[in-house]
From Swiss-Prot:
The lineage of its organism: Eukaryota, Metazoa, Chordata, Craniata, Vertebrata. It is an enzyme of class 7 (translocase). It comes from the Eukaryota. The gene is MT-ND4L. This is NADH-ubiquinone oxidoreductase chain 4L. Keywords: Electron transport, Membrane, Mitochondrion, Mitochondrion inner membrane, NAD, Respiratory chain, Translocase, Transmembrane, Transmembrane helix, Transport, Ubiquinone. The chain crosses the membrane at residues 1-21, 29-49, 61-81. One of its GO terms (molecular function) is NADH dehydrogenase (ubiquinone) activity. Its main location: mitochondrion. Belongs to the complex I subunit 4L family. GO terms for biological process: ATP synthesis coupled electron transport.
Length: 98
């Protein structure tokens, strides 16, 4: 495995560990998710360029569309929770507490 792939996989792993360790605040969880999506985008782009497979050229674009949708929904949820509760804790998202 080349060093480029190792660095990208290391970035994905660090973002995943950050998501698992710092999951008390919604904003830190969203940042870790964005880091994971960015590393997946770079990995798919590098893989597409190395294989020269023309049908896979839409995969990075579709991944960025899903990442933008995820960011928009996450930020809308963050604004709603912070306006309702005044905090951005993930534990406030539990619907069973209502």
């Amino acid at each position: 495995m080349s060093s480029i792939y190792m660095n990208i996989l290391l970035a994905f792993t660090m973002a995943l560990l950050g998501l698992l360790m710092y999951r008390s605040h919604l904003m830190s969880s969203l940042l870790c998710l964005e880091g994971m999506m960015l590393s997946l985008f770079i990995l798919s782009t590098v893989t597409m360029l190395n294989t020269s497979f023309t049908l896979s050229s839409m995969m990075p674009v579709m991944l960025m569309v899903f990442a933008a949708c995820e960011a928009a929904v996450g930020l809308a949820l963050l604004v709603t929770v912070s306006n309702t509760y005044g905090l951005d804790y993930v534990q406030n998202l539990n619907l069973l507490q209502c």
